[in-house]
Amino acid sequence: MRSVQHCRLDFFGTGRSLLQQTFDRFKQVIPTENILVVTNDLYADLVKEQLPELNSEQILLEPTRRNTAPCIAWAAYHIRALNPNANIVVAPSDHLILKESEFLSAIEKGLAFVAKSDKLLTLGIKPNRPETGYGYIQVAEHIDSSFYKVKTFTEKPELELAKVFVESGEFYWNAGLFMWNVNSIIKAGELLLPELATKLAAGKDVYGTPEEKKFIDENFPACPNVSIDFGIMEKADNVYVSLGDFGWSDLGTWGSLYDLSQKDESENVTLKCRSLLYNSKNNIVVLPQNKLAVIDGLEGYLIAESDNVLLICKKDEEHSIRKYVNDAQIKLGEDYI
């Protein structure tokens, strides 16, 4: 599982955070001792607090953010040192799954599929809006009742292109959930991301040992900053997709969170905090529990606070958040991201 900061939150009052719900979901089909969490050093205590079932060796701590390709590559080398023929599920920790039995069935079928081939598998979801925060999958031939060959894989397109994809009816969202054999993904990395593969393969003798953390702390920051989608999935010729309806939503996007949340009579969503809204509609407000939001005259806005950052922007301009993050990193460093 890939853990991010906001996954500590219980958005829907279930008593379990998004991270804990993801763990609960996967432990139904994967032994607890085989579950790993990859996260930043900053969140080590948080993960240990939320998932006491895991021991420290099951929590891989990145010394710095380097995007998903280095994260997944490191986990693959680590896993191969423990099990040279492991089959792997890579899952973000901010997903909501409403149809868990169908989802877990797809996971089990997917693991069986990648166990007998060198294919890289992703889950595809039929889109209901042009969303720039997801990758888009165009399918080619249907190889059996569950799997399709991927024709094109486009990582997080601009809004106009996303609109074209959705209107065509030929594209599916990439759910950001992948399955593969450990040797298949390492081979793909060696072919398509040789710089990254060379850097991490240099630690082959220390993975799974007490020296692993020192090696990662020294070498991980120099890994190329590239996503698994752009670095491998867009370029590989052995990518397949399993299509399904799992009641899936990526709560890493505010649009998804708004769609799934209970609304007041003016279509406003308030989560965690309390609010007084006047002459306002179609907004989503996410503030800490001890905060009161008093809002007058806003329509279609996102107002969200996390630690030391307050974000206020048009809800339909969510695709600009990537720009805000990049600008903040360039101008202010990572203290506010």
Residue ranges of model-derived segments:
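Hydrophobic packing residues within well-ordered alpha-helices of enzyme cores
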Residues: M1, V47-K48, I185, G189
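Glycine-rich N-terminal loop/short-helix segment of MobA-like nucleotidyltransferase
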Residues: M1-G13
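Conserved N-terminal catalytic core of the sugar/cofactor nucleotidyltransferase
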Residues: F11-P92, L98-L104, E108, D316
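Residue-level signal for inorganic ion chemistry
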Residues: L19, A75, D94, I137, ...
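A residue-level structural signature of the nucleotidyltransferase/glycosyltransferase Rossmann-like core
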Residues: L36, I88, E170, L177-F178, ...
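General beta-strand structural signal in soluble alpha/beta enzymes
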Residues: V37, L60-L61, V90, L121-I125, ...
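Conserved core of the sugar-phosphate nucleotidyltransferase
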Residues: E100-D217, Y240, N290, K314-K315
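Left-handed beta-helix
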Residues: V182-I337
